[in-house]
């Protein structure tokens, strides 16, 4: 009988010792397949995918010079003239106390305007004709849909057809991107805007593209690599057709450097900088003499 009691006591003790281990086993978290070092692969953002898609078509441009200025006053540093038209705040154009960050373009003849008007969450592009000395009520630009968020800084080339503007949205690499569209005379509306690609655009904000066809000069306004409330104005030589670096078979790191405008000196191989600087000097001189 004593032996039976002793056996039962030993068995009970063994079961008691096993219970914590079994409880731990039941409560133990299961490791994901692949072991404890497995990390979920992060998917690239739509902006990153768009950037990689645009990279091979980076435009071959020559950037002549650059200037860092206050974001609030960058229009004052672009030498607008009779050939290319003028730009100013929409608040000044409509003579109302509204958001002064939105701008208006007026053509060289002074009889046609494109204005951006709205607030920080929503804006729209409008056009207005000057008839008998008075500006007509602005009408929304046909063809520029709401998928282009908070559009601003419209600029139209002297052909009266090609329009550039900045906007946010799903077709943007990051923040504001620059877009180009042309007016379809037959359909009486603008064609679907296209992203200008690199190096016009970046993962930062790219606000304005203005072109003086007569002097063969262009201005790109962006806040890439700049502190808050500052922008960089790049002066470049525009091309009548888009040229790329595809035939040069550059390493990806070099192509990305050119796409990001890491050094304007690296782009001087793409044109005659001295000739372009002379055109810029003559333009500034003629503007100062007026």
Model regions and ranges:
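Bacterial Sec-dependent N-terminal signal peptides
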Residues: 1-27
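Short, conserved micro-motifs composed of acidic
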Residues: 26-290
């Amino acid at each position: 009988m004593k032996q039976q009691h002793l056996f039962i006591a030993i068995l009970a003790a063994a079961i008691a010792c096993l219970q914590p281990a079994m409880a731990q086993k039941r409560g133990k978290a299961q490791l994901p397949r692949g072991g404890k070092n497995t990390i979920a692969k992060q998917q690239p953002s739509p902006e990153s995918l768009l950037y990689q898609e645009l990279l091979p078509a980076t435009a071959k441009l020559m950037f002549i010079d650059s200037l860092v200025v206050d974001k609030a006053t960058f229009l004052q540093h672009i030498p607008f003239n009779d050939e290319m038209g003028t730009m100013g705040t929409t608040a000044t154009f409509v003579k109302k106390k509204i958001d002064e960050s939105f701008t208006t373009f007026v053509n060289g003849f002074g009889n046609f305007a494109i204005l951006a008007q709205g607030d920080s969450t929503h804006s729209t592009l409008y056009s207005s004709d000057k008839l008998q000395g008075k500006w007509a009520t602005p009408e929304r630009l046909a063809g520029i849909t709401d998928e282009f968020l908070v559009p601003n800084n419209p600029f139209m080339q002297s052909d009266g057809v090609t329009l550039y503007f900045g906007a946010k949205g799903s077709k943007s690499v990051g923040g504001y991107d620059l877009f180009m569209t042309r007016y379809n005379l037959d359909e009486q509306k603008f064609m679907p805007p296209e992203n200008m690609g690199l190096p016009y655009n970046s993962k930062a904000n790219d606000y304005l593209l203005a072109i003086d066809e007569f002097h063969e000069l262009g201005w790109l306004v962006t806040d890439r690599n700049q502190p808050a409330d500052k922008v960089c104005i790049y002066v470049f030589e525009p091309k009548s057709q888009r040229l790329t670096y595809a035939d040069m078979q550059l390493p990806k790191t070099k192509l990305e450097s050119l796409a990001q405008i890491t050094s304007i000196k690296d782009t001087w191989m793409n044109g005659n900088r001295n000739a372009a600087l002379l055109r810029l000097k003559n333009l500034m001189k003629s503007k100062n003499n007026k």
